[in-house]
Amino acid sequence: EGRINYAQIEKVINTAMDAGSIGVKLLGGYYPFTPEETSNFIRAANEMTAYVAFHLGTTETGSRLDGLREIPSLLGANGRVHIAHINAYCRGSILPVEEEIIESLQILTDVRSQIVSEVHLARPNFTLGKCDPDGNVLADVCQNCLRLKGYATTADGLRSALMDGYASTVEETRTGLILVSGKRGVELFNEGNTDVQMSFPVNNSTSAFQLTVAKNSEDEFIIDAVGSDAGILPRNVNIEQCMQLVKFGGLEPLELVVKLSLNPAKMIGLENKGRLTEGNDGDLTIIDPIYGRAVYGVVAGRLVMIDGRVVGNGAKILTTQRGAAAVEETGIPYQVIDLTKAMMYAGR
């Protein structure tokens, strides 16, 4: 009683698609559905050829290794899904980190034909600190972060973690968003009545490295791409961290291109991006090989970054044919994509 049925799930996805969305994302670490509901969301999205991404976790599992273990049963024989930020489920909360990595890679290999996936490489994560009226932390992700260091999963536990420098919240400054802990962090937490963004240094460097470079017996990457995951926070370090992997020997330079450009484009069916080929969009990022950062950027033939400074403006909304009319009404430029060509449905 009070749960969501299949017809309601279809309505949710249809509404999103008609409004211009390319699909849906299930936030299992924050607003978990039952396993049956989660499976139904995936099935309904697949039947509509809608994109469906999944931050793991249901009412029976967490946003941890147990959530990944649940994937085969949620997908069944035919389900297709994008599993978000695999490294977030390998923080050592169930098994030692090394064992979680091995098991995760095996699960992903077993369902490879049904999933696409990525990792992010920043040490800090992103979560929400909101608490219920009794002071209990609501988000499973935030609870897990507190438990990792023995803090209570309460508002007071968050205040202690902020004072100790383990937790941070976000403050907007003239130069952008910054992570803040200590006394100022507690002040922001209290001013927001606990409903604030939180960050913890919980992403393990070992899992980030091993999950990024791992290959199967066919010499293919088990995990398709590297993503920023909430890049609005001061942790969009894809290029910098991947260049460290190149310097270390974990990735070849062209493999960096596969992880950061080619596969992300293929994942959502952007056939004109991800490679320098005649007839494709003229996109180019020039990286300083010494400092490992982007210094020049060209998008569709237009210079958008000079010496690391963004000089471009404007953007396009990606939508599907059924959402084009709604997006057109906004007056914002848009591009229609064909999700039958997305890696999730078209294969690798």
Regions found by a protein language model. Give the residues of each.
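Active-site beta-loop-alpha junctions enriched in small/polar residues
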Residues: 1, 27-31, 55-61, 86-89, ...
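Divalent-metal coordination cores built from histidine and acidic residues
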Residues: 1-28, 45, 49
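Active-site neighborhoods of metal-dependent hydrolases
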Residues: 13, 22, 87-89, 95-244, ...
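Acidic (Asp/Glu)-rich catalytic clusters
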Residues: 13-18, 41-47, 71-78, 110, ...
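Active-site microenvironment of metallo-dependent hydrolases
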Residues: 14, 185, 189, 204, ...
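Short, surface-exposed connector motifs at secondary-structure boundaries
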Residues: 20-25, 47-53, 80-82, 194-195, ...
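Active-site-adjacent beta->alpha loops and helix N-cap segments on the catalytic face
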Residues: 31-44, 63-67, 97-98
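Flexible loop/turn segments at secondary-structure boundaries
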Residues: 32-34, 60-62, 90-93, 124-129, ...
